[in-house]
Amino acid sequence: MSQKDYKKYKKIISQMVASCQIREWEPENATVSESIENVENTENNDLTIRGTLLDRESESAVYNDITGLLNERYDLLNELLSAWNSTVDSKDSLSVNLPDGRETVMYRVKVADSWDYYEQKAEDIYDDIYIQEVFTPCYLGKLYDEVDGKLYRMEADGFAWSIDENSIKIWKQDWGNRYIVTAKEQNEMTTDVLFIIRKEDTDNKYEIVDEVEMN
């Protein structure tokens, strides 16, 4: 996608969301709030980070987060792109030009008491360079960050970059392991997607830790 197309698309999407502020979120564990300067692709530098404190030594905590967010993000895409006839207001819609040249119409779907809830979901999904390049639900946000020596799973979405055409770097541990999520369409005639989660070490040796199929 050219820079010109990107700017045009970015402008269209910016009309759909009220701001770059993340939604209020009440964590179950500890939280951290920080101010970020020069946040890429945002118009508001006062972006608040809220996250859940994780046990650095617990591999299962990282793995559970990955699978949980896969399900959450995939569900969000289906929710936003589905025709909710009982809740859609046809007068409240926005024509969106997709990166591949197609045009679609986004309707406001009342999924909560506040429109802000919907707008934030739209921002989370569409304000992502990976989505803009390939328009696929196969992505995760920046999952982890470290503040004052403590590891947090982030709720503000600064997006991870793809390692190759199909993979996204999730997290690199101190001892060198990293988690990769690869999304593979099972069948061109269906919307089924197989997410393969694998763990790599510093020698690029890997093991598949799970396969999650969604449709």
Feature names for model-found ranges:
Residues 2-7, 179-183, 190-197:
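Low-complexity, intrinsically disordered Gly/Pro/Thr-rich segments
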Residues 141-188:
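Surface-exposed, charged secondary-structure patches
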Residues 51-148:
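Core segments of small alpha/beta cavity-forming domains
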Residues 20-28, 190-215:
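Short beta-strand edge/turn micro-motifs at domain boundaries
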Residues 30, 144-146, 197:
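Assembly/interface hotspot detector across virion components, adhesins/toxins, and nucleic-acid enzymes
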Residues 1-36:
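Surface-exposed amphipathic alpha-helical segments
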Residues 24-60:
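Intrinsically disordered, low-complexity repeat and linker tracts
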Residues 4, 28, 37-45, 176, ...:
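Intrinsic-disorder/low-complexity regions
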